[in-house]
Regions:
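Active-site pocket-shaping loop/turn-to-helix segments
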Residues: 14-42, 60-63, 86-100, 112, ...
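Conserved catalytic cysteine-centered active-site region
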Residues: 27, 58-112, 133, 145-153, ...
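Conserved beta-ketoacyl condensing-enzyme motif
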Residues: 23-114, 119-137, 193-207, 304, ...
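N-terminal extracellular/periplasmic Venus flytrap/periplasmic-binding protein-like
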Residues: 10-13, 26-35, 43, 168-279, ...
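Glycine-rich loop/linker segments at domain edges
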Residues: 10-19, 103-162, 232
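Phosphate/pyrophosphate-binding loops at sites that engage ATP/ADP/AMP, CoA/4′-phosphopantetheine
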Residues: 39-52, 158, 162-163, 282-289, ...
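Condensing-enzyme catalytic core of the thiolase-fold
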Residues: 181-182, 273-295, 311-319, 336-350, ...
């Protein structure tokens, strides 16, 4: 088996994911994806005719984000028509999965040059005009077997079951903001950031738009929990509620609501791309690798609680790599909700100074299908900046899943 080498990674800044407010909200998703694909080709000097495939993550494949966004973005970026593309959906885990699939295709010897990444325009979600989204899409047989609730209600259910308090999740949210502010001020993201321009050539965004560096613990403590109302709103003509879906599996659970906008991931727009190559191709074409993929894993857990798979996914990917927690220098666990990162740190007994060192999605935002690829690129940048060797990225995904990946510098 050959190595899957990481040649380069880039991403857009994350824009506030609200139509009429966010700087990227008026950009077509294909053009946002084209921005990073074009930048990746320019930065590395690759012949795009050599790209075997473009594997793209997009979770909300509706409207302008439908129709194989990976392929369309490549065509819009001016790639050679021989550069094929495919778009996948593993919900929040799509951006890690796209990289894992690209790495697998290279490690198997099937392909030599593959781009992975993702795009998510969350500012478009408000335009759907649909009713409450159900993971089972009305399949009552699946609902009876695996009731699946709203992600925010799941976060509060997990916090209740784990004994994680409002103070705990607020403290993690505040730390995310502090670390992100320091990272931005220190230029930690500059290596990978690609500015986004409108069709008329004017600048749309060249910096992170979502962070709130003025956040304080006092301010967070004054915010009302976001999900009590969501939990008890009827979601079908039978009056079923999101709370009832959790109680179907945990009938004695009295949910304590602790999450709000200040300790949950931000709704944003964004895109990212990562170039991977085989050693043979990289050497023949003068591409200098920055890292390699060490191991990958996927793990499922309770679909009803949804958010608990990152811990077992981490244990699985470490076992595949023959490594231990102590062998990992830095961790990126997506802050979908503060409880996810807090439980992850506690269960694995991690040093907090090694986890999400530049802040996370609470401060920076979570463009669903792109986040995993963003985190992998951010991790590689930080390993280089600190002259460290190895890092691990994982994240929860709807349906009770988590992909994971370990990378190391070369």
């Amino acid at each position: 088996m050959v190595d899957a080498l990481i040649i380069d990674a880039c991403r857009t800044p994350r824009g506030i994911g609200k139509a009429g407010k966010g700087a990227l909200a008026g950009i077509h998703p294909q053009q946002l994806g084209a921005t990073v694909l074009r930048a990746l080709a320019d930065r590395t000097g690759i012949n795009t005719a050599d790209v075997d495939d473009i594997i793209w993550g997009t979770s909300s494949q509706r409207g302008p984000q439908s129709g194989d966004l990976g392929r369309m973005s490549a065509l819009d970026a001016g790639y050679d028509v021989r550069a094929s593309g495919v778009t996948l959906d593993r919900f929040c885990g799509s951006g890690i999965t796209s990289v894992n699939m690209a790495a697998n295709s290279i490690m198997s010897g099937s392909e030599d040059l593959v781009i992975a990444g993702g795009t998510e325009m969350m500012s478009m979600e408000g335009r759907r005009g649909e009713g409450p989204f159900m993971m089972d899409n009305g399949n009552l047989r699946l609902r009876a077997r695996h009731p699946q609730s709203h992600q925010g209600v799941c976060a509060d259910a997990v916090a209740t079951l784990e004994g994680i308090s409002r103070h705990d999740v607020d403290a993690l949210g505040l730390e995310s903001q502090k670390r992100a502010a320091l990272a931005i001020a220190g230029g930690h993201f500059n290596k990978s950031l690609v500015p986004v321009y409108r069709e008329d050539g004017s600048l749309a965004l060249d910096r992170e738009e979502y962070p709130r560096p003025q956040t304080t613990m006092e301010g967070l403590s004054g915010l009302k929990p976001a999900f009590p109302a969501v939990a008890d709103v009827p979601i079908d003509d039978k009056g079923t509620t999101y709370r009832q879906l959790i109680l179907a599996k945990y009938p004695d659970l009295d949910i304590t609501f602790v999450h709000h906008a200040g300790n949950s991931s931000g709704v944003v727009d964004g895109s990212a791309a990562i170039l991977l190559a085989s050693p043979t191709y990289a050497k023949a074409h003068g591409l200098k690798p920055r890292g390699r993929v060490v191991a990958m894993a996927n793990m499922g857990d309770s679909p009803t609680l949804m958010l608990n798979a990152p811990v077992p996914a981490t244990r699985k990917v470490l076992a595949k790599a023959g490594l231990t927690i102590e062998d990992i220098d830095l961790f990126e666990i997506n802050e979908a909700f503060a409880v996810v990162a807090e439980k992850y740190i506690r269960d694995l007994e991690l040093d907090r100074d090694k986890v999400n060192v530049n802040g996370g999605s609470i401060a920076l935002g979570h463009p669903i299908g792109a986040t995993g690829s963003i985190l992998i690129g951010t991790l590689l940048d930080e390993l280089e900046r600190r002259d460290l060797r190895r890092g691990l990225v994982t994240m929860c995904a709807a349906g009770g899943m988590a992909p994971a990946i370990i990378i190391e510098r070369v």
